[in-house]
């Protein structure tokens, strides 16, 4: 594991923990890579003792199905385990409801089945599916909905976004059961002058939107403008994007937040920046979306997403983009996290396969990095490095972790965050 210093347009920290100005600011096509973390900055790896402004529970891609486990390359899919994993996750969130503003479901609550034509995966006619497939989708979706209703305490709001697998039942059924309003995207007011914008990245994909709708037409026009090679790499039929109507709404909400002096967190199923998930797994027009966010980085601070099961992260400009590791594929048994929001930073405390991350949201925040220890990690190792300074820092970190962290959570937790890349 390589321990690194953060790099961002806020400036890079030197060995004394003092920002040094970076004259080579990142462009939309080229971003600076992090440099090696020096031992001199180890004093910055202190515990977080202050309380957050508020905390959000987050999980992604539970993806239940009543079928045998699957594999994809070296990854495992624990379909039947998903119900128990979701139940345990929501039970813990409920136990900590006093410390949570809400819980975010980042999409793909269940796996679903379809009878789509393999010849044109950008087209879907769900009305032609067999009654058996339709009934199976409704049954398994309802089983997961029941878990959310029984496991999550009534005074803790569940906020959901639409995932591609969620479209195996109709859009209207999903929205009704998951307590959406009229729209597929919406705003949630958070404490302490923060706002959560919940987006729909199934938008713009003709497979998932109403035929001949404006989003359907826009999606077809966008696909027609791209080469087959581009579509093969970057426009997978199980993804989507943000069409014009939704994008205009998004801009209005960000402008309003900016005017009111509020900060914004964005959640969606597909990641919203190139590099924050694997190629083909981000939103189709992620380059346009992220460029806009970077122009509003005084207001937009963090974007969280699911969809790409191994997870991911990138910082573009001063905006952090986090892809949460899938609950479905967690070999250790689970994956979810607590997103703590502070005045100058956000900290994702991961449980199970979910990586912990510290993200600086102003020049006064601690440096950005990631950690993967949570409740299951042993000693920290240094991989692909013979740097004695890195070895010393890793040893120092290990000394702080001799007592395993508890999986329980409270707003008073002060577990050390181990910074690595």
Question: In which residue ranges do the predicted regions lie?
Answer:
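Extended active-site neighborhood of metal-dependent phosphoesterases/phosphodiesterases
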Residues: 39-48, 76, 114-260, 285-300, ...
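N-terminal active-site segment of His-dependent metallophosphoesterases
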Residues: 10-21, 31-135, 420
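Histidine-centered catalytic micro-motifs
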Residues: 267-272, 301-311
